[in-house]
């Protein structure tokens, strides 16, 4: 693998923050910020696909977001539904596979059906995987993985002493995908907000002051360039990493 290819993250995860503040700054209702954020999603997908990123995970709706005003939650659900129906064909035409992770049980049946339809419609995509986290929380993900393993133990298919970090990781919602190499958060906040808690253990973190609707092509390329200039050590010394790169 050439050096430039090594500098490209296989998996990028993004916390899309700042939609409401973007709208408030313009004296617009909060949902206007979320609608504007769809354009940023398209831009980031384009940059990731052209750069060689294999997986992009977007934090669209957290399990804590249900605590927001009912009117805002309702508007977000309508936006999610319309975006799924509108964008599925675009993703299919661009050979992009859509996956949705999270607890779907709380969503309206119509939205759950739209999720399944969009995933089926784009299932043949081979260029790129777009993973959307909806009603997702990192703690929920670890708990559901533990429950899956507990059922295997209860059924006699697995011994407790055989449970390893690798086995638990495989039971996470993202289990069959590479771990995120880079996690980006927009909006100026410096926290991960219960997003991919297990998976981000060794991810590089990148924080942008831009609100999500303003985070487009140039901003995404800047984040990827920053990643390319970092040295990922995974517990090793700089000297060890440099020696391995030369060998």
Locate the predicted segments by residue.
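Flexible, compositionally biased loop and terminal segments
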Residues: 1-247
């Amino acid at each position: 693998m050439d050096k430039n290819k090594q500098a490209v993250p296989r998996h990028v995860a993004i916390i899309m923050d700042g939609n409401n503040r973007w709208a408030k700054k313009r004296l617009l209702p909060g949902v206007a910020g979320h609608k504007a954020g769809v354009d940023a999603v398209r831009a980031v997908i384009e940059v990731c696909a052209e750069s060689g990123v294999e997986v992009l995970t977007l934090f669209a709706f957290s399990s804590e977001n249900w605590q927001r005003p009912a009117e805002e939650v309702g508007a977000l659900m309508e936006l999610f539904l319309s975006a799924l129906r509108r964008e599925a064909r675009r993703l299919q035409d661009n050979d992009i596979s859509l996956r949705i992770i999270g607890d779907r049980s709380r969503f309206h049946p119509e939205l759950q059906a739209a999720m399944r339809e969009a995933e089926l419609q784009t299932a043949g995509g081979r260029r790129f995987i777009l993973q959307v986290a909806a009603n997702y929380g990192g703690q929920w993900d670890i708990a559901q993985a533990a429950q899956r393993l507990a059922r295997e133990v209860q059924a006699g298919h697995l011994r407790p002493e055989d449970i390893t970090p690798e086995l638990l990781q495989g039971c996470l919602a993202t289990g069959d995908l590479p771990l995120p190499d880079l996690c980006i958060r927009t909006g100026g906040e410096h926290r991960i907000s219960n997003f991919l808690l297990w998976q981000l253990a060794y991810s590089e973190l990148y924080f942008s002051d831009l609100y999500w609707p303003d985070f487009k092509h140039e901003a995404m390329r800047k984040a990827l360039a920053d990643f390319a200039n970092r040295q990922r050590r995974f517990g090793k010394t700089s000297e060890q990493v440099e020696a391995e790169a030369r060998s």
